[in-house]
Amino acid sequence: MNRDDLYRCRDIEMGIKSAMVVYEIKFAQVTKTTQHLSDMPKSIGKIHYDLEDLIDYYRDKIVKKQKEAEELIKAIESQFELMKDERYVSILRYYYIGSLSIKEVASKMGYEEKYTNTLKTKAIEDFEKHHTKSN
């Protein structure tokens, strides 16, 4: 595991959050459309199934991304166990796995934003040192 894996993890987590928003919007649209169509006579069956397929498609995309994230997080967490400074682990976990902004991480940890950025840089370096030692 190296910094690229941390970046990839953050990208996946942000993608999941974004996909969840799209899913919720689509689900609301499908629910509203289905309710509207249920008042109509014929041929709503096919439309209803098409709408269900659309919802299933978005749900499957999210589940696939979540599985990918889980595998990556498991590997990252095992490398975190090798790190001695809990501040570093917390910053990396909040930022890359929790998808928090630096401002949110700083607030959560009670640090200034600039100091949090400095610690994040050091934390990434420490994370990569353990990659070298463990492989």
Language-model regions: role of each:
Residues 72, 86-88, 119:
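N-terminal positioning helix adjacent to the helix-turn-helix/winged-helix DNA-binding module
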Residues 1-80, 125, 129-135:
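N-terminal interaction/assembly modules
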Residues 83-100:
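Short amphipathic alpha helix immediately N-terminal
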Residues 116-127:
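DNA major-groove recognition helices of helix-turn-helix
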Residues 104-109:
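Short alpha-helical "recognition helix" segments of helix-turn-helix
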Residues 82-83, 110:
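Short, conserved sequence motifs enriched in acidic/basic residues, glycine, and aromatics
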Residues 91, 119, 133-135:
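N-terminal functional module detector in eukaryotic proteins
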